[in-house]
Amino acid sequence: MAKSLADLRVCIFDVFGTVVDWRGSLIQDLPGLGKKYGMDTDWTSFADDWRGLYQPQMHRVRKGELPWTNIDELHKEAFEMLLTKRGLKHPGEEGAWEFTHLWHKLRPWPDSNEGIGNDVRFEELIEIQHSQGVRRNQGMKAEVVR
């Protein structure tokens, strides 16, 4: 623990796309969950389309067309939009959240933990994003800094 602010060594980082392989994680996990709910589609393009809705939704929030909305709600809304667009049956509320929470299970790139672990300057590593398997002391969500 740092004894003074001058000694504090903290690294706060966003993991999305840089530290975690969001695309590979979703492409790997979506087919199994789809099978569980009797859904079949091109899951690779589904993952790309799902991610592609992020910026347009954030733009709506920034413009005030949507109130401040946490990322889970935005991901769920985008998921449901894609179901309609692709003519897929809705897996129910619980199922929709199960799909949405795949964004919490993004796996790191093979060299991520080694790279983070080699930086000994930092006593605290704080990740801004949900992920699975990233070396860190704490996780931080947007709600903390809202």
Go through each PLM region and give its residues.
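N-terminal helical cap/lid subdomain that shapes the substrate entry/recognition surface
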Residues: 5-110
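Substrate-recognition element of Asp-dependent hydrolases with the DxDx(T/V) motif
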Residues: 94-106, 112-146
